[in-house]
Amino acid sequence: MRIAFLGTPAFAVAALDALERAGHALVTVVAQPDRPAGRGQALREPATKAWARARGVPVLQPEKVRDGTLAAALRALAPDALVVAAYGRILGKDLLTLAPHGALNVHGSLLPRWRGAAPIQWAVAEGERETGVTIMQMDEGLDTGDVLLQRALEIGEDDTSETLAPRLAALGGEALVEALRLLEAGALVPVRQDAAQATLARILEKEDGRIAWTRPARRISDRLRGFTPWPGAFTTLEGRTLKVLEARPGADVATPAGEPGEAEVVPGRGLAVACGGGSALLVTRVQLEGRPAQSALDLANGLRRKRFRLGT
C-alpha cells in the first residue's frame, strides 16, 4: 500500500519500521515541528523525522493541520491509507476521508479503555495488569472510532510507563501490518466501541506527580511507576521538594505510627512511610531539591534523624 504516515515521538518509530519491513510504500512522514528541548533549549527534531531523513522519505511538518493545506498536500500524493501513531494533533474530516481506506490509528491501549493522550501512563498508574494496542478506524471523536484489531500485553509488577512503551510500540507495529493485510483482503470486521466502558487518559500535568500519602501504598507505587519518567513522584521535606525515585509497597515492614507521611528508617533497607489504610511504602531512592540522587538511608543519615515527616 501507499501510506502517508503521521506520527511524532519514538513510540511511532516502531510502526514505521514494521511498515518498511512489510514492503509498504511510505509516500511521506508528517511530524510535528521541531521544538526546543533540553537545558540549552536547542531545536530538536522528532524521532519520526530523523527516521524518514535517514531513508530519504519526504517529511512534512505543518504548524496547522485543519486549514486544508495538509489535506491538499497529502491528496496530491494519492495514498491508499493514512496511518497515525502518536501524532499529537486532532485531525479533521478532510484528512480522515482523503484516502480510499481512510485513516488508521495505532493506539496504546485496549480501547475503549484509556482514550486520550496518555494511555500507557494511566494504565500503569491505575494499577492495571493488562493493556495492549488497538488499530482503530479513525473518526472525528477522541479515540472513538471502530476497532479493527487488538493485541493484549501483560503489565509486569515492576513495569513503568517507560519500560512498557517500547514493548507496546513493537506490538503496535506488528498489529498494524496485520490489520493492513486483512484490510487489503477485505477480511476486517469493524467493531463499534462500547462508550459505557470508556475511560479517559488525560494529558499529564506536573501536579499529578505530587504524592498524597493518604492513598494506600499500592496506589502510590502504581502512580510512581505510571508517571516515570514524567512527572515522576514527589513530596516535600521541610519546604524542599523531595523526589521519590524508587519505592514499593512495604508489606513486610511495620507501618510507622502517626499520620500518613510519617517516615521511619528501616535499617539496611530504606524508609518506611505511613500511607492510607494503615499501609506502608518502602522508599529506597530519593532526590532532595538541590542535591544529587541518593539512597533513602543516606538521606536519613544526612539529616541525622531516624524519623521525620514528609509532605511538610
From Swiss-Prot:
Q: Keywords, A to Z?
A: Protein biosynthesis, Transferase
Entry superkingdom:
Bacteria
Q: Which residues are recorded as binding (6S)-5,6,7,8-tetrahydrofolate?
A: S109, L110, L111, P112
- Any keyword Cell inner membrane? no
For this protein, the record's PROSITE patterns field holds: GART
CDD domains noted in UniProt? FMT_core_Met-tRNA-FMT_N, Met_tRNA_FMT_C
Q: Which InterPro entries does the record associate with it?
A: Fmt, Formyl_trans_C, Formyl_trans_C_sf, Formyl_transf_N, Formyl_transf_N_sf, Formyl_transferase-like_C_sf, GART_AS, Met-tRNA-FMT_C
Gene Ontology molecular function terms on file: methionyl-tRNA formyltransferase activity
Q: Name one Pfam family in it.
A: Formyl_trans_C
Reactions catalysed according to its record: L-methionyl-tRNA(fMet) + (6R)-10-formyltetrahydrofolate = N-formyl-L-methionyl-tRNA(fMet) + (6S)-5,6,7,8-tetrahydrofolate + H(+)
GO cellular component terms, A-Z: cytosol
EC number(s): the record gives 2.1.2.9
| Role, per record | Attaches a formyl group to the free amino group of methionyl-tRNA(fMet). The formyl group appears to play a dual role in the initiator identity of N-formylmethionyl-tRNA by promoting its recognition by IF2 and preventing the misappropriation of this tRNA by the elongation apparatus.
Q: Which family does it belong to?
A: Belongs to the Fmt family.
Q: Please give the name of this protein.
A: Methionyl-tRNA formyltransferase
Organism equals: Anaeromyxobacter dehalogenans (strain 2CP-1 / ATCC BAA-258)
